[in-house]
């Protein structure tokens, strides 16, 4: 247990701290550990020895800046230098040099790495902790079978099981098992040592037959017996050194290496005191495990819960980077061995610098960041997304589970998750429960366990808080912990009452005097996403989960706005995301514009560059706007510029808009949403999106490709935006089909394509006439916009054959439109169904038209009542010009606290603004509103308010797609699937039934033949459309039916067709 040193106070830790601590642990400890494991390498004749001197390693500061690495597609990394020595044993001379081993990608201030110009982040993984676990299962006779499973550091498993006769077996494979005596003897123990080190020697002697004695008569016999069972080898193998090495490699290395965490866990579980540096399984461990298993058989001891967090460990970024460094150094060892051997064979004098190459380390890390499942591209949709991505916990990945094999018990919430893993925030779909999110205060301990903070209370008074303790999952089981809805913030309230508490994974109600620990904050069990939901205690957990996920999909708007109703975490999320520019020094502002801010302080001048229209990997716009004026004095930590989706240093993902909950002509049926045209014309929900288009130039066999403006056979209007070099000009407005970069690729024309004069020139002068085809970069469908940046990228120091890249960045301004998706913070999502003129929208008693109409039926069945509280409190806040920051579980102060707060604020707003309709006692929170089309009041009063509504990244411009004709699949001859492949619409079984129900036979036949997979009918339709005339009726079967016939034929089933008639049936009418 660790305290933070300050008594009775706590601060929310930095949200990126998990990533920073992991990388620091790798640089500070893991790097030295792996380098110190690098062995001394000798040649075959043992004359030359190569070794590394770890104490003098050095990491060099990168030469490029982060922003340049992104634009030039480079890796932001540090060069690793180590001193190496080459010793000649005969002359006892040593040559020492400082050598370059490779590049290690660095972590930036966002907790991410930049690899090949792409922001990447490493996800923390939850694995079964190495150690021993005892479980019980019922066999087919209903008898309990006890097993002990030893899990190695590599994830390998060795199972011990006890049968009806109390004999203990070690299962070495799915089908083969050997006696525990044979395994112990093969590991180096004799029978006398075995019997001396067990608690039940009589049980071990009971199954010691003469045959068994012969097997364990010597270590060699035991190893041979073990090898026969493990490798399933028949006959009598001969004992040899190679046989021992094979066993060592295939069995002992994979299943018996415990690591320091496994050694600690086994010592604790079996009450052993073996030193921590013994990281391999010993015979003493096997015998102690067998003793414990016998005790389980006779009812002593407790079984293990495999899903408890004390039996899990976190594989952080430090562990993953250290594993990759070990792998790279193993490859480097092989390279050095080969180079030394080659130098001696060719009688060359090697030097340390010639022996070592940087390729193994550099390529290992680049492949890790590029290919490893736990290394992901950073999601930069908005500031919240960036932070939450780095705090994910995954059961998936190498050594973990898969979405197909994980059972429900693993996915479910466990009591040990309390305060460590958020019970709400997880992914939806096949990975539900397998990808979680860290709670706000959780941290990773030294042994890979998740720790959560609690306040320790005085023994007598239980009134004051002494200090904050961080407890691991194995420690907090032994304490009575007051649950989160107890009074964690208010000391003045009487606490001598019964309180809900947690003890040994059970939730109890106990007297306050019995409480040992209490939680420190009401939302310490939630993740960041869930903690941003106001009134979350009034929502169903499924809807809170959807809200946590949808807030990460919110698009930064062109004019953001703070939420009226929040939880108080918005500021820290914005600051830790790195999106706003924050002053690192105090001083005076000398100059400010959209590109930079110049600050003078302590005699120095600092220039702070601002981000201007930078593209995120989700095509959203990252932009910083200065918030300070020239001549103003600022302090360290003050906000200089707001970023995307931040206002005044607070997270601002959406807008506070006027909403009514009422049906309107069926346009908000099934979660559809009706909006006013003012949201479009006033740019309320307008966002900017930046797309990147890229083209490369290569050197072909016919010559190099050329970037040029002179493109033959193309209309001039398509080339109107190109400059003299053939690249689109900055600031140009481009439409679909326009040329962004003109490029010609050389090719040799066929003889038949030459004109007569070309053939004459070739015959007389022998001139080879070359032609070129245009391979220009054209703007695809839906890409219209303004060109804001053009970059010509070529890697330095490369040959002329290196491809040049030209990148064009185009900005799009997107207003909200029909088909876009919007959502609140309570899982209330919907699609825009209609945009009404503002004069037709329902309006309030003060004449204001509402901006959005939601369906009231979306509330009771979804049980997300929090949106109603937020809606009404938002209205009161807008009238009183107040902002509210409400922590969850406010019912800990009194019953119905949320409802009382909302009603009191509405009442105050009604009095202050002299608008009695704001709070009407007959139906509080509701108001009578009027139909904009007729001016008549609606029959029932309606809930109106100002909730915080987000615009999500699922936009109709990215989804809508149409095609007349296009590509067809080769096998089925049906249209391809998806917008990216210019695919067609699928008419499945249910669609066919719907058309059959309406009796539209001809339309159905068109869809299943002409428009799908009837090859000849497709061609005839095209011909008749051009020439004119009637479309012929298809007579033969479509291609998919022919495919079915061929598949049946491959199964030796021939399908024939014939005309059905009475003659074929041979019906006997008299018999009928």
Curated annotation (Swiss-Prot):
In plastids the minimal PEP RNA polymerase catalytic core is composed of four subunits: alpha, beta, beta', and beta''. When a (nuclear-encoded) sigma factor is associated with the core the holoenzyme is formed, which can initiate transcription. Pfam families: RNA_pol_Rpb2_2 (PF04561), RNA_pol_Rpb2_3 (PF04565), RNA_pol_Rpb2_6 (PF00562), RNA_pol_Rpb2_7 (PF04560). CDD domains: RNA_pol_B_RPB2. InterPro entries: DNA-dir_RNA_pol_bsu_ext_1_sf, DNA-dir_RNA_pol_su2, DNA-dir_RNAP_su2_dom, DNA-dir_RNAP_su2_hyb_sf, RNA_pol_bsu_bac, RNA_pol_bsu_CS, RNA_pol_Rpb2_2, RNA_pol_Rpb2_2_sf. Gene3D superfamilies: 2.40.50.100, 2.40.50.150, 3.90.1100.10, DNA-directed RNA polymerase, beta subunit, external 1 domain, DNA-directed RNA polymerase, subunit 2, domain 6, RNA polymerase alpha subunit dimerisation domain, RNA polymerase Rpb2, domain 2. HAMAP family: RNApol_bact_RpoB (MF_01321). PROSITE patterns: RNA_POL_BETA. One of its GO terms (cellular component) is chloroplast. Its EC number is 2.7.7.6. It is found in: Plastid, Chloroplast. The lineage of its organism: Eukaryota, Viridiplantae, Streptophyta, Embryophyta, Tracheophyta. Keywords: Chloroplast, DNA-directed RNA polymerase, Nucleotidyltransferase, Plastid, Transcription, Transferase. It is an enzyme of class 2 (transferase). This is DNA-directed RNA polymerase subunit beta. DNA-dependent RNA polymerase catalyzes the transcription of DNA into RNA using the four ribonucleoside triphosphates as substrates. Its main location: plastid. It catalyses: RNA(n) + a ribonucleoside 5'-triphosphate = RNA(n+1) + diphosphate. One of its GO terms (molecular function) is DNA binding. GO terms for biological process: DNA-templated transcription. Belongs to the RNA polymerase beta chain family.
